[in-house]
Amino acid sequence: MPIDSDDNVFDDDDDFIELLQDSSNQTSNVTNEIATDSTNSTNTRLVVPNNRLLEEIPVPKRILLGPTHHKIDYGNLDKYVYPSNFEVRDYQFNIVQRAFYHNLLVALPTGLGKTFIASTVMLNFLRWFPESKMIFVAPTKPLVAQQIKACCSITGIPSSKVAILLDKTRKNRGEIWDEKQVFFTTPQVVENDLASGLVDPKTIALLVIDEAHRAKGNYAYNNIVKFMDRFTNSYRILALTATPASDVDGVQEIIDNLNISKVEVRSEESIDIIKYMKRKRIIRRNIYQSDEIKECIDLLCTAIAPVLKVANGKGILEITDPSRINFFQCMDASRKIVANPTIPEGTKWSNFFTLQLLGVVGQCFRRLNVYGLRSFFSYFNEKYTEFMAKHSKKKSSNKLNADFYFSEPIKQLMKRIRTMIDDPKVFSHPKIEAMMEELDEFFTINNATDSKVIIFTEFRESALEIVRFIEKVGKNLKPHIFIGQAKERDKFDESNFGKKSKGKRVGKKQQDDSKSSSENAQINGMNQKLQKEIIKNFKQGTYNILVATSIGEEGLDIGEVDLIICYDSTSSPIKNIQRMGRTGRKRDGKVVLLFSSNEESKFDKAMNGYEYIQQHIMKGQLIDLKEQNRMIPKDWEPKVEMRFIEIPEENHELQVVDDEDEIIRIATQYMMGGKSKKKKAAASKKGKTKEKRAKQFFMPDNVEIGFRSVTSMVRAVGSSKSLEEEKKEEKVRDVLDRIVDSDSDEEIPLGSIPIPRSEVIAHKQSTTDEQLLERDCQSGSNISDRTLDQHHSASEERGINSNFSHESNLPTPPENSPPKRKSIVLEEARIAKKKHKKSLGIRKPTIRPPSIIDQLKKQKSKIIRPDSANETICLDEDDILLPEYTNITEKEVTVQEDRREIEHDDDSEIFDDGLDEQLAMIDDMNTTKSFVEPTRIDFKDEVFKNDFDEHEGFLNNDELMELHTSYFTAIDPMDKVFYYDPSSSVHVDGANREYAFYGKIGHSKRSQVLIGLQKRAHEMAAKSKQSKTATPSEPETFQNYLDSDFIALQ
């Protein structure tokens, strides 16, 4: 049961401070949520340490616009049944048709047959989808009982197919969900069973929602629809309400939460329903203040004026007229002050207590103007007593409060109000006098036994005061209070203030026999059992007047009422409509509105705004509807079949029962197969013990299962790619930038560029040693001795044999194609070198004159090594001398006589498109290649003779400068080897591998011979300069030296 609105009044200072602190926390949380914003599309935003605002990537909603997954009975799909047992109303007929094709929100005034519409739709969905489930949810048990009776009585749905689920502790709920098709329950039960896996959401074809205006926030209605959306979009929703919302935003929220695709709204003035409406007379009576109320207001204004002046000076309240102080405005200003972090703590709480005192006076004005003297005295006397007790014990030191409560006007007020209350001739409020006039007139005309009256008021104290006054008058008037379950709030106890609590539990308040039933109910509250008893007595005539708070506005079948008196009014059009809708259902009714102060203007403003909203909603304006999701195939249009529904015998028992508990008991008995709960339990014990039901885990269709990284599910705000995709792209860009921007020989980690496996395999299959060799020649750089020596040592260590005279499986080259160089050692060395070098792409080369190395190599084109007779290596004339080599036949090698080394010029770093080179490589890959099998050659020892002069091969200054600038590069000091330093001589370890003491990699023997040659050449050049004239023997001596060195290389 809902709690009365009077329980929300802040009568206790501590409770009010606690609420404001909670409000402050909520406001600070809202501030923090700017960083972690929860958007309307369920995207959660988060600020990460690098100040990037991230959001969750929304999962695209699956909208099923095609055939439904529910099994359809096509034999019944060509027609839909419309009950002819009742009068056919145009608006009902039209709404039923639209409910077949849309998720529909129906807003009809009370008493116009919303339940009939729901029952007809459920009947036809049961015929069309016999294996699916239809669920009717209502917020309270009494409403569920009413809907069961109505549906079974209207449409004749067999009770054997109907289940009622009101108890979440029932153990066999899973079996009930499996066996039945139509369910009546509360939304909390459905939400719990969906989350527990007891019901498959994909089996729900129709969901009927009663009191749909509750579908806001985190209510269970919204959670059910959200859960179903995760699994399927093929379902139908029928939402019923009398008052959807008081503003456009409220209506839009319901539409969004329930996936509404069409809205059907009718008002009491709508053309198609006005002829079915009973006449309802609405009478307005404006009540003016009595002299006693005016006197109390004047005294309060005089006492609070200094406090209001202080608040105006601080700028915390704009109201300057004391009589216009409003409680809700003061409360709102207090919350803003507490939530403002820029205000110092001392100033903050000083302003807070000032506004709190002004709020107390504002509440006093409201009670005096609307409810009268007794309601005002009950409230203000408690505040006055509480302050005096705290001040006397020095628990309160607020000077502003003390000046107010100890002021002379307050003393006079307390004295005068006690005198007024004790005077029986003084009405608490003129409204009571007007109310009694209306009651006398009504019961004079109508029979006091058959006629019923409900009086609505907001506060319990006011309700009890009205009951007491009516009871004193008598005259066949039998009133009773009708309130919620909450107990009366404990008031301030002056006698126990300041004493230590013993911690004893507060027991249930005992009923006082000296007090009336209404007084005891006001103290202890009314539980559901007592509420049903009062309603039953009201229907039977034991009571003919109910004085109700908001509990009587909706959710209870109170019965037919002839007169409604609204003792006060609210600014909520929904509450006003629900109050007035309690009459004029089956016969004409009357509504009396009692207005005082500014109540009439608030009422008109609320109702006019509501009518404006209804008119625009009926025109389809101001709201955004969801897309239609059709369940019936497009080529099927069921035609109406008017049929007289025969009610099954098992449903007759429900028709004649009015008691809600009895309806629930009968429906539960049918659900359990005609057995009572005790008999069902006994039968289950005698039978075999059933296995425990395994928990089911339902998954949406085509769901992605398994683990996913968090970075794949979030993205930067404004980006369309996930963080995982951005990281991959960034990694590729970094590697490409390093390749393009680097001019050094820094190593690129292998595998740093992600390449698809298919491309790697294709590259391996198409890349040949000839292409690698050709690329290396184009690069214009010689293979370093250190690299070759390192490779050669590694090959020896792995035990690789250098005899390549075996048969090759490579394809033979085409005719007229020049033979290719087939140095396997060169190929492996160059592949290793390529892996460790970056490339700037193909650049336009510049031709460079032969270097000293080229000149030296030209002098020795063939060198025979005696111990290499078993090795055959194909070697170009221009290649660098290797540790192991042999002669090559003319068929295997074509000597390139005029080869010139290509050198990259820094002044011509212009990128070429590289098409010529790429086309040549493609041509080579597509050309069938074959190699001539190497043959053994008998070698003879012979001395190399040269014919160059003594100055050939020496560099001039320009050539030396170009050598140092073009061929030398800066190296790491740890890699530097001091060639002429005895301490850095080459050492040999146990594995016969050479290395330098200070360097990381040693030189090969051939490299050291070349270094020695260069050193001796410089010495001889120096000697020749000193002598200025060369002797004939010097060239011969130098030539002999070169011959001996080259022979040593063998």
UniProtKB/Swiss-Prot annotation:
Q: What is this protein called?
A: ATP-dependent DNA helicase MPH1
Please tell me which stretches of this chain the record labels as motif DEAH box: 210-213
User: Is the keyword Ubl conjugation in the record?
Assistant: no
Q: Where is the composition biased (Polar residues)?
A: 800-810
Q: Name one GO biological process term.
A: double-strand break repair via synthesis-dependent strand annealing
Which key words tag this protein in UniProt?
ATP-binding, DNA damage, DNA repair, DNA-binding, Helicase, Hydrolase, Nucleotide-binding, Nucleus
Q: Where in the cell is it found?
A: Nucleus
In which residue ranges is the amino acid composition biased (Basic residues)?
Answer: 499-508
GO CC annotation terms, alphabetical: nucleus
Organism this protein belongs to: Scheffersomyces stipitis (strain ATCC 58785 / CBS 6054 / NBRC 10063 / NRRL Y-11545) (Yeast)
